[in-house]
Regions:
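PRPP-dependent phosphoribosyltransferase catalytic core
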Residues: 1-79, 84, 131-204
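Short, glycine/charge-rich flexible loops or terminal/linker lids adjacent to PRPP-binding catalytic cores
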Residues: 60-111, 121-127
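Generic enzyme active-site microenvironment
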Residues: 115-116
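A short glycine-/small-residue-rich loop at the edge of a beta-strand within enzyme catalytic domains
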Residues: 120-121, 152
């Protein structure tokens, strides 16, 4: 089982993520909003919005959760991904916008929203994050009218997670470097039964 584990260096991780972003942002006129996926509350939205109709989003986007706020928390892939989007914005600040405000989304005519994450497992957390966009009235309107499209960039994903995320209401296009090795796709039926039996014996 240990032989099936795949080691990924931070350098390889960054190179692959950068390449996938470049693949999406292939038009000179593209205006890109960049976000890094994180845990969210059930009722969280990207922007505040007017409760009375017409509901209109306003103000700053919800913030990233930075590990540097609490030094007890180790900086992992989330820190790397935030560094990546910072570099893209510095590379071309007229094309890339990190966590843009609702006003910038309108004035700059953002047409692509890219959400970065390290891996897609079950797809639960990413789906909740995507729902924050769908539950923000102005963004929902832009998505429905085709003014913006959502893209998800990750290093690896399970086939199950991909199938769930692709059914999200935001209709995201998912770009990934590789499929995650799982017990189902890495072993034969006989091998799976053997490992499951061993695991059961250990638990007992």
């Amino acid at each position: 089982m240990l032989k099936k584990i795949q080691w990924v260096s931070s350098h390889e991780f960054e190179v692959k993520i950068n390449a996938l972003i470049d693949e999406i942002c292939n038009k000179e006129e593209d205006k890109i909003a960049l976000f890094v996926e994180r845990e969210v509350l059930d009722d969280e939205t990207v922007y505040s919005f007017n409760t009375e109709k017409p509901q209109r989003a306003f103000g700053n986007a919800f913030p990233p959760i930075l590990s540097t706020i609490d030094k007890k928390i180790e900086i992992g892939s989330e820190g790397i991904l935030n560094n990546i989007i910072t570099r893209f914005q510095r590379l071309d600040s007229r094309k890339y916008y990190n966590y843009p405000s609702a006003e910038i989304m309108r004035s700059k005519r953002i047409n692509k929203v890219i959400i970065l994450t390290d891996t897609i497992g079950s797809g639960n957390q990413l789906n909740k994050y995507l729902n924050c966009f769908w539950n923000t009235p102005s963004i929902k309107s832009w998505l429905s009218s085709g003014h913006i499209n959502v893209y998800v960039v990750c290093f690896a994903a399970t086939e199950f997670g991909l199938s769930r995320v692709e059914l999200n209401k935001t209709k995201p296009s998912v770009f990934y470097s590789r499929i995650c090795p799982t017990i189902d796709n890495s072993f034969t039926n006989q091998e799976r039964k053997k490992y499951m039996k061993s695991a059961t014996n250990i638990i007992l």
